[in-house]
Amino acid sequence: MNRNNNCFMTAGDIRLLLVLMGLFLVWIIFATLIVPLFIESAYRGESWPFLNRIISGRAVHSVRHYLQFWHRVTIVGSVVSSLGCLLIVLVSGSPAFIRRIVGEATPGSLGAIRMWTCAILLLTTLWEDLGSIAWLPAELRHPRGLLGYLYTLPIGFERLVTSEMSLRAFQLLTELLLFLGLVGWRTRVVLPLGALCYFLLLGVLIDYSFFWHQNLVPLYVMIVLSFTPCGDGWSVDRLWKISQGRAVPDAGRTSPVYGWARYACWAVIALPYVANGLGKLYDAGLFWWNPINIRTNLYMDTLNPREYDWALSLYLTHAPDALFSLIGLFALFSETFFGLVLFFRVARWIFPVAAIMMHIGIFLLQKILFLDLILLQLVFFDFTRIRKAIGGRLASKRGQLQVLYDGLCPLCCRTVRVLACFDLFTRLEFLDFRCLDLNDYNRRLGLNLASRDLEEEMSVIFRGRVYRGFYGYRRIALAVPVFWLLAPWLFLPGVSSLGAWVYGYVARNRLKFHWDDSHRPVQPLEEGASAEVTTTGDAARGFGYALAVSGIIVVSLVCWFYRIEFYPFTSWHLYTNLDTSGKVQYRKVFAQRESGVSSRARLEDTIGAIALDNRYSPHIEKCFGELPGDVEICKKFLSAAASAYNKKVQPGERVTQYEIQVWIWDFLSYPSDPNYGKLTDRFAFEINTGRTLREKKLEDHSVKDTAPPLEPQAVKAGAGVIR
């Protein structure tokens, strides 16, 4: 939308659309004529190695099967997706849609989303233990997406994931980039690099576990932010420009560009919820919320080992079915209709709160923590009114601080411009004493300020008192939130003398500092704008954002429809099955130690990289696998886990044997079973000798929930398998 003439598309937009149409035609020709030749060559094993590996079902499927699959998925999908994308562009790019739905936003709104997203990813990265991935054998790595190609390239990526020191250094680099993205330093460079590093970090963790979905949505948001002017607000980049007196976007003025960027972030958050809700309806039907199905999901996640030990859902075994139906309906409604946040303002007050409640319920009843999604809901709320209300209340209760500075001092002007940016609640009023009638000012406030004193020291007037120099800065620190953590330290004994000496030294030498912006005026605006501002009037970029949002929607729909699970792409079909059998299968882990004591074991205490969210579950499932090599992978994992654990504990507490048990609980028939089911399968592994014992179809189903004997003679050879 062009603000001046309200044209839907500019000449540049039309050229861009024609270029995209040309590229689409080239893709259709390439996909129709060239790619089938590569498929036939790869089927014969005569193509590049990575293409040959993709065709893994030669013994089952003919080459015609792969050619038909390519035609159906790629060519037909491309045509339908392109037409859908064009339709969405035509709708979302209309002036009415932009004005009523997308809206406009300030640079501070987009900058706040950047800060919050980087803070979420930084927080989740800090509690990861990426370096411990190197303790796992390479056989446990199963690439589940784009990272699979990096392992085959001669760039040393495979050596990286096998080196503990390199992984820890890479994690520190990722944390540094996320922190720099949070504060907004060199945003245009740091944000894409931070997104790339986190993409690699998360991918490595997934390759050694399973495709879990925590922290995936914040990664999507960060990728989107990398293509937006998110550094225009709440950033060091903005502060630096303001301190130099350079032009920056008006902090208080809204723009369609920031509105579109914010809308794109909202879209990548909302679409996964919609996809998950639709997946439940598509896979399980309208009655996914069947109470038996909901009980199955809750009991299964509660009984399986995780980093949290509570079992709240097991206290609900005698609760009425209506409660579980309400839980299911609430989750289904919250997810399916979450997309309304993209169209209605009132929905942005309802569904994010519902999502927070849903994720808290998942955490309490299923022991799965989606901290990233809980925190990310805050990007839908506009806290400007709250901030202004707090500022108004503080001003009425405590009053404002008047800061008198020397407008001819370059250092003073720069300092005041920066302080104005930090003044979140507008507690500070900056006055150039050279523009004041000082006699009238003294008479009105009952003060005795002299021009000579103001030339030497900045003065802060608060409640009729004058605070000069360092003591003025100390008073400012109490009023500006960003300095609140620093303020108490400024009152420690000795700090006042040191601070006054430092301030005096800088004040005496302030004219020796030469700035290009030496005498720019200071006229602070809302949210810390500088005197000289620019407007983001590049409305032509609106069409590009409409095209980008349309592409995001189409890609999400394609992934959902074709059930694509190829990191970082996912279909979001989570918990979409309908299970009304009333039976839950889960696992228990026991360990025997050098002291002879046997008890429940926590694999979460072994290797930190797989300690969260039951990430080790694919490896212990291999203990009961029937495919060649499954048991060997299980043994290698248990050996690595025992080795890592034994390094942390004292002699006598070291693990000598692990046992994995499979239990099945028929909660419909035996809801009051104190053991929550019967033992149906067990796998024991002796760490030192590598000997394994497998016992199936146990005759004695009265096993208590205590540690069973793990010695080899405890399992009869005739009842199981000895390896």
Predicted regions and their residues:
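Alpha-helical membrane-anchoring segments
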Residues: N2-R443, S451, K512-R723
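Thiol/selenol-based redox catalytic cores and closely related redox-interacting motifs
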Residues: L436-A531
